[in-house]
From Swiss-Prot:
GO cellular component: cytosol; peptidoglycan-based cell wall; plasma membrane
Key words of the record: Transferase
Domain of life: Bacteria
Gene3D superfamilies per the UniProt record, alphabetical: 3.40.50.2020, Biosynthetic Protein domain, EreA-like (biosynthetic domain), EreA-like, domain 2, PRTase-like
Name the UniProt record assigns to this protein: Uncharacterized protein Rv2030c
Amino acid sequence: MLMTAAADVTRRSPRRVFRDRREAGRVLAELLAAYRDQPDVIVLGLARGGLPVAWEVAAALHAPLDAFVVRKLGAPGHDEFAVGALASGGRVVVNDDVVRGLRITPQQLRDIAEREGRELLRRESAYRGERPPTDITGKTVIVVDDGLATGASMFAAVQALRDAQPAQIVIAVPAAPESTCREFAGLVDDVVCATMPTPFLAVGESFWDFRQVTDEEVRRLLATPTAGPSLRRPAASTAADVLRRVAIDAPGGVPTHEVLAELVGDARIVLIGESSHGTHEFYQARAAMTQWLIEEKGFGAVAAEADWPDAYRVNRYVRGLGEDTNADEALSGFERFPAWMWRNTVVRDFVEWLRTRNQRYESGALRQAGFYGLDLYSLHRSIQEVISYLDKVDPRAAARARARYACFDHACADDGQAYGFAAAFGAGPSCEREAVEQLVDVQRNALAYARQDGLLAEDELFYAQQNAQTVRDAEVYYRAMFSGRVTSWNLRDQHMAQTLGSLLTHLDRHLDAPPARIVVWAHNSHVGDARATEVWADGQLTLGQIVRERYGDESRSIGFSTYTGTVTAASEWGGIAQRKAVRPALHGSVEELFHQTADSFLVSARLSRDAEAPLDVVRLGRAIGVVYLPATERQSHYLHVRPADQFDAMIHIDQTRALEPLEVTSRWIAGENPETYPTGL
């Protein structure tokens, strides 16, 4: 089954973020931009591994660089296991608990310290020659390493540096456990941890290239100046200059048909994202591109990040079936928060267009284009839809389904989260067996049900089968919600991928012409490839990644971005829809780079090789979901991404406006008061 297989692949695969130490240093430098051009800043790299990282930081900040030598004190017979550290100046830090636990004698500890002390002096002489260490008294010292594990070496460095009485001590590393970063936050003036992988296995797991740094490389880096007017490098503007030459005009976020045709090619699956769930231009441009793909390229379905039964009600409407008389009614099934995500003016107009377009074809025929959902939040609604279907075709099977699904009645009605909590913590039964049995029962009788009424019956059977699959996957998902964020996220995206695959198979079965082609509508966080983002280090996967692995060149992904404007979002989960001001993008972000490039454009390394270099750099990328928290924007809405690998193309619209819900509240109309933003005072 896809879920198990994908989970196994995730555990076996390396979870890298940075190409090498130099790239990690460039990422850190962007996060340390506040220290740029400050005359009292000195960058110290912990030798040897921290020097390539530190050189990039120092060069970007236009600050002097020096090496600080720290030697790990390894346990007897196990040199790689640190029991402490020795820093320049003779400062020794020892983990007393480890020393006692390993029964290391004082004499053994002295022998280890003396041996490492000799190596420390040798390295200082090799790196610096006769030159004395840089005077850091009264200075702001940024201490850089290639990562932290236990933090013993960094702790020894901090203790030794304090003796020199610097004005401030700042620690900056590309990767470290969250617990270690928090520990140092209480010891120094500032801590910058670019990534905090969970679980944290080793520093080297965050790098594709983690080869050992040599003494010669350290000497070469120290001999290469990092400060001085002639050395200042406008890296971001240079990247923007390159992008200006290759950016393709896309008014309103919509490229020309020729550009879109070249980008899509013969792909069967085109995933079109959004960097927020509440931006009008993202929805409008996506709808316009989808209309052209349906009309001119034979795409036969939209598969959205929406619940299966609610989306299928829309599918019936656009095919001229069901009882709804207009698009507003067809979308009324979307009642769960956030309703505006699909109950909005853009989706309403698209649904009405799709119904009008489909009327040119025979009602119910698969030459019509459909509208489907990929998500799994519809636990109880899907249960009701399975039973409703079986009541019509097999009353005895419906009775069996009622008996099995009664297991879910122990939790609050329509509350999958309450079921998950009860099952996870033993406060209620797990309904896993019942959900699986019912899915098997529906699948076992599928052929008999399909023969009862031809093609239309087979469509409804497929609908029922997917509802049963959704119940089974939602049951697992809601239990997993209370065991970890990554686990539940992966289950959700694996379910989306499974549903997409089943939909392709279903549509293929009835096409005489070329294979079925589907447009996917979902957030960038699902559409993009997780392997090109820092969440990959946590073991997280995405729909876009799974689709690429399964379908290769038969798939394309398009991401959206914006620099500023307004967005429809809530301030908390389940909250009211608000029209909120979007802050200008952070320094060092993809959005800032695009802001420096043009107003509305498409850029793709597939269409222009020159676009690859500026996009093949780790930068911050913004992701606004249904909740937007400007006060904690860096922590809540940004992650490190490599755009060249995350998407096949990106479309940037510099200033955007909030998506209009069908049910507009007075608070949404009022928006935010710019005079009091963001303090609210």
